[in-house]
Design a protein with these regions (language model features):
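Short C-terminal tail/terminal secondary-structure segment
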Residues: 1, 86, 97-110
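A conserved structural motif in NAD(P)-dependent oxidoreductases
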Residues: 58, 70-81, 92
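Active-site "substrate specificity/gating" loop of NAD(P)-dependent dehydrogenases
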Residues: 1-6, 11, 28-29
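Active-site helix of classical SDR
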Residues: 12, 20
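A short C-terminal helix-loop "cap" of Rossmann-like NAD(P)-dependent dehydrogenase/epimerase domains
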Residues: 52-70
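Conserved SDR Rossmann-fold cofactor-binding beta-strand/turn motif
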Residues: 33-39, 43, 89, 102-104
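Short, flexible catalytic-loop segment of classical short-chain dehydrogenase/reductase
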Residues: 17, 39-53
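Alpha-helical segment proximal to the catalytic Tyr-Lys
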Residues: 25-29, 94
């Protein structure tokens, strides 16, 4: 999903998805699954830093208007991203490869 002023960041996220799919094919037969996780707006120091940079150094976390664009109506938590990563690292995900997991409260689906 694109946003103003972050074209390079957005392009790099899409590049990771393409790399994931290619690497999954290249690792065929090795037993090494390749997947990626694509987090959305996560309550984190990174998000706080971005918000401050966009708003002159004194901005709080995302405002209500930003959160309204997320169907879950809240920011994600790092633990929610970690849960997907833990699943992908487990034996239960042994048949999963070449996939991109979006953890964004439905933002890119809306």
């Amino acid at each position: 999903m694109g946003s103003p002023h972050i074209a390079v960041y957005s392009a790099s996220k899409h590049a990771v998805i393409g790399l994931t799919k290619s690497a999954a094919w290249e690792c065929t037969g090795t037993g090494v699954p390749v997947n990626c996780v694509c987090p959305g707006l996560i309550d984190s120091r990174m998000l706080s830093t971005i918000m401050q940079a966009r708003n002159g150094g004194n901005a709080p976390m995302p405002n209500e208007k930003m959160v309204e664009r997320i169907p879950a109506r809240r920011l994600g938590q790092a633990s929610e991203v970690a849960s997907i990563v833990a699943f992908l690292a487990s034996d239960e995900a042994s048949y999963v490869s070449g996939s991109a997991y979006t953890v964004d409260g439905g933002r890119t689906a809306a």
